[in-house]
């Protein structure tokens, strides 16, 4: 992984223009439903959170990012709002140098937008590096892998009508601004800069959109 530093510095700063959208899901070791998004305490002594994005369309400063993936691993204290998060960012190794720089700027928060609001909570960047990333979506099931480091899966949970998943909106602490569909994580394993293994825990799924 790359040299530790401030995540918001990835990809540079200054005036930027970007708009990206696509598929997103996250898994964590909290019980369903995660209390962290409501500024409460995690189920365990810490929150191990893994986030995966697949860009279906979008660009930064004219650099096309369609079809590329990014994954972030987060290790936070029991209350995420206390800050001091340890994070690692993985960028799709299929990207060109120009695309990788743009991808890193967008998903680190360095380009501004929604993710920039989480930057003050980060205490340590364990690394930022290219990786072979797989992102798959089949109906209400999603799966992502970072070769040699991470595997995560999620199944959406059906709501009261027996057909559609439950939806959470307007949570005060979230990596996305869009309504999130409730899901359950399964067979999650991360062995990168730290280790975390869990299953049957919380997951959220949505169609993300960032711009700045």
What label would you give each PLM region?
Residues 39-46, 78-83, 127-145, 182-185:
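Short, surface-exposed loop and linker segments with low hydrophobicity and enrichment for Pro/Ser/Thr
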Residues 16-60:
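N-terminal ordered "arm"
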